[in-house]
């Protein structure tokens, strides 16, 4: 037996051992506890961070003051004031600083005629999944993600025919003369939502605050099975802190700590088999990424805290982030233009294998451009891979023949 055969056998044994370890760990993982039935979203106290993030001494504040029309905040009594937004690809329900429901109109839940669209964000306690954003402050009043109210009142709006975008404004009026106007902007044929917060200080004192953006989800109960692609997909939280990181939704979610990673130009995301959601702060913003398990561990949370602003009297500051709610379309993901965001496609946890997977997909996509059929494109890719590996296979057969 020559050295090549020994190496191949050793490599095969190593791969088999690693696969067995991973299978054993997943098989032994207990089911996540179900969330008790409820009619409202998660309690405010369970998902609002404490104001521990440092606020910079000098925020991004323009010199000239900007006048803002006075806004009276409506008390939160009875049903919360919500706005339903319809675009050509999305239907969303906004409740202040939260996106409580998101339907992907071009993706039916099943092939059954009349099947409803895939619902990525949901208030259903068993499938609870939402994106939230609010503010915290050490010494001043600040709005959490429940405090914003629609500036034009509750109701339903739609992207008009011939229009490329639609904006939906929310507002919070603080008791100290501080107004925060939040504007959601939706674009045609886009799953990317711009979320812009404008802080205007008409009060006598300096206002300091830090914005937080988070994704909260009840971990899905995935049934194991050879025909269920979800059982082979990564279900957990991912983020970029200078390198690609991820944690599975299981009992180990917080085993390695709550992260507390500070990064400039990072992002947070929750991917699943075909779709994902992500908060992408501005490239120049510094955020602190952390994990949590609120509601007694029944839900998993990933949060990006920051940036902080310091707004003097008569001044204003603005912070903008993007919220992605949609499918894993490679060309659209590349257009997001954020470092490492293409890793949400989950070619592999390991960078070298992810690079290989990206290369194979590029070849597959190239073949599809010529052939026009995914089935034949896959067959063509397999043939090309076989041809590329032919010299190695030939050497292996010659070795076995000896």
PLM features per residue range, with description:
Residues 82-344:
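Soluble non-transmembrane domains of integral membrane proteins
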Residues 349-371:
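Hydrophobic alpha-helical segments of integral membrane proteins
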Residues 11-16, 376-387:
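Hydrophobic alpha-helical transmembrane segments of multi-pass integral membrane proteins
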Residues 199, 314, 385-402:
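Membrane-interface amphipathic helices and adjacent TM-edge segments
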Residues 9, 25-124:
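Juxtamembrane extramembrane loops of integral membrane proteins
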Residues 30-31, 333-355:
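Interfacial/capping segments of alpha-helical transmembrane domains
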Residues 3-7, 371, 375, 379:
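Hydrophobic, aromatic-rich alpha-helical transmembrane segments
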Residues 2-27:
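Hydrophobic alpha-helical transmembrane signal-anchor segments
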